């Protein structure tokens, strides 16, 4: 299997169904390198990364897709972002003492809520919310699409702390098959075959092998893979803008409280940005410079 992170689209020639597969290794490892997550949390975060990458691949937009899960349990927050140029990042909040070995989504995130946000550069923001119901994240997402006025969509996800993989099938508007019964039969046939794929096979097999294993009797067109990379969009400029939005009085108060330097830490990548009194003065003097103060991880 290729070790380059990628998503790859495929189409069935004889029916109105498309698919997407995603493989994350390096970017997944970079996300995990930023925080020492327990294994069950790392696995769930990997599934979220794969899911967001799959969803982003089905959309034609310029902007950001955010997948966020909140709960009252040991993992109160999971958050993953995937941009339209296929850059991903993610984080989790957890209570280590409350996490048992082998815990799944329902144990980690009871009474959870999943929010899907599509934030385009231009146009209206979209947000969908669904309860975290189901055995796993794939089932929860599949249920969301089944219960909303969306195209029928199914997910298969797995992650093991080293690799995150995902498979998506989505029924398209009627074109090749017009008869509703034929469309439903085709959809059920393809998803039933996908249900035979084990979690271990999803992690171990490359895309071509997975598709042959499931659909060797179907006519499938596999498109060129698209790269995915880890990238954190934090910057010194964004941090400076956040301080400006607080106002000069609050920033000066923070300088006093933090003994002469305001510290801003990125929750995603742990990058640290420091602003001393001179930096803050420049911000509010309109100098347009955030200065050369050191940053560190």
Swiss-Prot record:
Gene Ontology CC: one annotated term: cytoplasm
Record keywords: Chaperone, Cytoplasm, Disulfide bond, Redox-active center, Stress response, Zinc
GO molecular function list: protein folding chaperone; unfolded protein binding
Keyword Disulfide bond in record: yes
UniProt-listed GO biological process terms: protein refolding
PTM comment text: Under oxidizing conditions two disulfide bonds are formed involving the reactive cysteines. Under reducing conditions zinc is bound to the reactive cysteines and the protein is inactive.
Lineage top rank: taxon: Bacteria
Gene3D superfamilies: helix hairpin bin, Hsp33 domain, HSP33 redox switch-like
Pfam family, one: HSP33
InterPro entries in alphabetical order: Heat_shock_Hsp33 (IPR000397), Heat_shock_Hsp33_C (IPR016154), Heat_shock_Hsp33_N (IPR016153), Hsp33_helix_hairpin_bin_dom_sf (IPR023212)
Main location: cytoplasm
Transmembrane segments: none
SS bond partners: 232-234, 266-269
Location within or outside the cell: Cytoplasm
Annotated family: Belongs to the HSP33 family.
Protein function: Redox regulated molecular chaperone. Protects both thermally unfolding and oxidatively damaged proteins from irreversible aggregation. Plays an important role in the bacterial defense system toward oxidative stress.
Protein name per Swiss-Prot or TrEMBL: 33 kDa chaperonin
UniProt organism field: Pseudomonas paraeruginosa (strain DSM 24068 / PA7)
GN (gene name): hslO
